[in-house]
Design a protein with these regions (language model features):
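Long, compositionally biased stretches enriched for glycine and/or charged residues
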Residues: 37-302
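Conserved structured core elements
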Residues: 2-7, 26, 30, 181, ...
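Inter-helical turn/loop segments and adjacent helix faces that build the functional surface
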Residues: 13-22, 44
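Class I S-adenosyl-L-methionine
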Residues: 14, 34-38
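Rossmann-fold NAD(P)-binding glycine/threonine-rich loop
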Residues: 1-17
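Flexible loop/turn segments at secondary-structure boundaries
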Residues: 6-10, 32, 207-210
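Acidic, His- and aromatic-enriched active-site or binding-groove loops in soluble protein domains
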Residues: 18-34
Length: 302
């Protein structure tokens, strides 16, 4: 499962296909670890050893070491406090992923996200939950991030794919692999060749975070080999992160329950719980508009 929203799809798979052989993944942390590697002068993010816990698009690094066991957190924290994830190569020639203006703002805003808990290093997506007022104020409803992606990355990728199909070859097609491709290839190699590498996966908690819902689909480091994955226990997590995660995982579980039961009430509750939405009345308005916009795709909600 390499989809978006991976968290909701992962929860749906857990509920509806509990015996399926599914690995749920997201590459956003990989891109951020590339940035952290550059902060520390390390060429390959795969040299980093780390502890991480959270939900998909909703997590924190609590420990980061190099391959010699040196603690990199002080150096990374110093950079985050000054610059967020901005590292000076956002507009570097040849760089194609996460170069849109919204991503530049997101990487810079990570400084403020980090300030909320300077003991951990946050995932960038937390800006939507911790600073929703900022996101609304700096967004253009007539040209959203979705429009930006469709006019940029999507147009380039789809155009390159059509060109490859027309030519019958990918040679000299100008289409280069990036973080998305490298991550899935590394994971496939680990499964096929039993490399026992460490990956961040979205898996049933079952004690990986002992003071959190055991049925939650959490994002934690796992060792991956030919027999699948083994979770690395992260230990109890702080109250702040635990509270945020409990609220967000309830959103995700209620969305899946709403789909299974065809329940308007539960989807309204899910949106009401989301920290991106200020009130139940706004949640209801959004839900009604979503139903109208997606009437050809959604089940009937009662």
């Amino acid at each position: 499962n390499y989809s978006n929203p991976a968290a909701i799809v992962a929860e749906a798979c857990r509920v509806l296909r509990p015996n399926s052989r599914i690995i749920n993944i997201c590459d956003m942390p990989i891109d951020l670890m590339d940035k952290m590697s550059r902060m520390c002068g390390i060429k390959d993010r795969r040299e980093l050893q780390y502890s991480y816990y959270g939900l998909n698009h909703f997590g924190w690094w609590s420990k980061i070491y190099d391959k010699e066991g040196n603690d990199l957190m002080p150096q990374i924290k110093e950079h985050m406090a000054k610059n967020g994830y901005l590292d000076g190569i956002e507009h570097e020639a040849g760089k194609e992923q996460h170069v849109e203006e919204s991503w530049i703002h997101t990487f810079g805003k990570a400084k403020d996200v980090y300030a909320v808990d300077p003991e951990t290093i946050p995932n960038t997506y937390l800006k939507y939950y911790l600073y929703p007022d900022y996101v609304v104020e700096t967004s253009d409803p007539n040209y959203t991030r979705a429009n930006e992606v469709m006019d940029g990355r999507e147009k380039k990728v789809f155009g390159a794919c059509r060109d490859i199909i027309a030519k019958g070859t990918a040679k000299d097609g100008g289409f280069e692999p990036d973080v998305h491709a490298n991550y899935i290839v590394d994971l496939a190699c680990a499964l096929a060749e039993n490399t026992l590498e460490r990956f961040l996966l979205i898996v049933p908690n079952d004690g990986a975070v002992p003071n959190f819902d055991p049925t939650a689909m959490v994002e934690v480091p796992c060792i991956v080999g030919s027999n699948g994955f083994e979770k690395i226990c992260q230990g109890p997590i702080p109250q702040f992160q635990k509270g945020l995660m409990e609220q967000q995982v309830s959103v995700e579980k209620l969305v899946v329950q709403a789909w299974v039961e065809g329940s308007y009430q539960k989807l309204w509750q899910a949106l009401t719980l989301s920290k991106t939405i200020p009130s139940a009345s706004v949640a209801k308005q959004i839900l009604d508009e979503l139903i109208e916009a997606n009437k050809d795709f959604w089940p009937e909600l009662k």
